[in-house]
Amino acid sequence: MAKKRRRFTLKKVPLAAWLVIAFFAVGSMLVVSSYWSQRQSEVSQRQAIVDKKAAEKAKKKAFIKRLVPTAQTMQQQYGVLTSITLAQAILESDWGTSTLAKDYHNLFGIKGTDPATTKVLRTKEYVNDKWITVDGRFRVYSDDAASIRDHALLFVNGTDWNPQQYATVRAAKDYKTAASALQTDGYATDPDYPQKLIHLIEAWNLTQYDN
């Protein structure tokens, strides 16, 4: 008599078990999706930062390039190093973004006395070993080139009380000597002024424009 074959049947999985499995499956998918979404967000943020820095650097290079021709002409005519002119313009105008530079083309913070050709603005001065805010009367120019020319002529003609005040700046043959002379000759009150100029000149290789 032939034996009956035993049938193998799958045991029914309780509904609760299926729900648990589905819960963990969906949860895993959500975790993975969230991870990749976060990664994409981080990548996008990093790229945005890189793009912003690149745009800022491009603007700064464009600012330098725009001033170079006039600055080099002033060096040829009056002996003021182009690298010094560029570094001062960058530092004094914050890359051409200051109100004085944007609205009045005064790149160097040069002051004046004639109300018809000047504008009163708030400025910071280093007095008695501390920074203070004061009102200053600054010259207004028609364009940046006019500001650069006036800057060079200031070194040539000096001040009303001392025509030779900036003679050592013009006589300097290298940017470090010229930067130090600006401090000793009284151009700026900031005790760190020379070092700030030197840093800008070296960081942006501004000596390449000296002729």
Label the model's feature ranges.
Residues 1-91, 95-211:
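Catalytic cores of secreted/periplasmic lytic hydrolases that degrade extracellular macromolecules
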